[in-house]
UniProtKB/Swiss-Prot annotation:
The record's free-text note on cofactor binding: Binds 1 Mn(2+) ion per subunit.
Entry GO MF terms: hydrolase activity, acting on glycosyl bonds; metal ion binding; pseudouridylate synthase activity
Species this protein is from: Dinoroseobacter shibae (strain DSM 16493 / NCIMB 14021 / DFL 12)
Protein name as annotated: Pseudouridine-5'-phosphate glycosidase
Annotated function: Catalyzes the reversible cleavage of pseudouridine 5'-phosphate (PsiMP) to ribose 5-phosphate and uracil. Functions biologically in the cleavage direction, as part of a pseudouridine degradation pathway.
Length: 305
């Protein structure tokens, strides 16, 4: 491991894995702080970590707790983070602020990628990436996740972009950023709660070993930047597009009526969709995160073989 700043605390299990060149999978924490209510959030986080351990890798949930940048959380720390009422949601722009001000915060995809690369963690599992929001023509609301994927060398396993986004424009920005977008056993881009879409995916690979080999060639070419592995939600857990799209449209109309913008957009939409779907969206969300964690662990193991 490289020397890390004094405000960074690496969990013993993660430190040992990195020092012995064992597979590690990074996990973000906005899904804990902003994605679902307590105690669902902590139960989900523990279950996802167990999925990774069961596949032979070490989980490293990344977060900021009271100004300390945590790479890997113990059970007590996970519970403490899950109970924080006013946690920040941090990206590249404000991760330093949260640490310097002694705040607690959930890390977005972008912030988690930054910390993972700093620690030498190659693979990261999340639910869905951020992207271009609908109505971008007037709001210019584009997630920093997309530019981070273009600049930071981490493999991100996700169920595509969150379906609340303008997914075609999100795919265009990823292409502009030079991000390798790989469909795992799929020819269309997964749409988060739905396993497929009408958008063709640029690249397809059918095994963790193939993804690992692709990354090794990218390393040899010194390309830099990230890879997005789009992993469809399991068929038994998906919500049909015609159903989920109705919930999304209702939630977005309410959001516009209430003039909600900025970082409040995604948490508001996810909460309203949870309410409109009577909890079904949350159950699907948990299932797809677990599915992504399993694939991420398999890729991490393959990279170290």
């Amino acid at each position: 491991m490289t020397h890390l700043p004094s405000f960074v605390d690496v969990h013993a299990d993660v430190r040992n894995a990195l020092e012995t060149n064992a597979p590690v999978v990074a996990l973000e924490s906005t899904i804990i702080t902003h994605g679902m209510p307590f105690p669902d959030n902590v139960e989900m986080a523990k279950a996802v970590e167990e999925e990774i351990r069961a596949r032979g890798a070490i989980p490293a949930t990344i977060a900021v707790l009271d100004g300390v940048l945590k790479i890997g959380l113990g059970a007590d720390e996970l519970e403490a983070l899950a109970k924080v009422k006013d946690a920040l949601k941090i990206s590249r722009a404000d991760i330093g602020y949260a640490i310097s001000q002694g705040k607690s915060a959930g890390t977005t995809v972008a912030a988690t990628m930054i910390v993972a690369q700093m620690a030498g963690i190659r693979v990261f599992a999340t639910g869905g990436i951020g992207g271009v929001h609908k109505g971008v023509e007037t709001s210019f609301d584009i997630s920093a996740d997309l530019t981070e994927l273009g600049r930071t060398d981490v493999i991100v396993v996700a169920a595509g972009a969150k379906a609340i986004l303008d997914v075609p424009k999100t795919l265009e920005v990823l292409e502009t950023q030079g991000v390798s977008v790989v469909g795992y056993r799929t020819d269309t881009l997964p749409a988060f709660w739905t396993s497929g879409s009408d958008l063709d995916i640029p690249l397809r690979l059918d095994s963790a070993a193939e993804i690992s080999e692709f990354q090794k060639v990218r390393d040899a070419l010194r390309l830099g930047g990230g890879m997005l592995v789009a992993n469809p939600i399991p068929a038994g857990d998906e919500i049909p597009a015609e159903i989920i799209n109705g919930y999304i449209a209702t939630a977005q109309a309410e959001m516009a009526a209430q003039s909600i913008s900025g970082k409040a957009v995604t948490p508001f939409l996810l909460q309203r969709i949870f309410e409109l779907s009577e909890g079904r969206s949350l159950r699907s969300n948990i299932a797809l995160v677990k599915n992504n964690a399993r694939l991420a662990a398999d890729i991490a193991v393959a990279l170290h073989s």
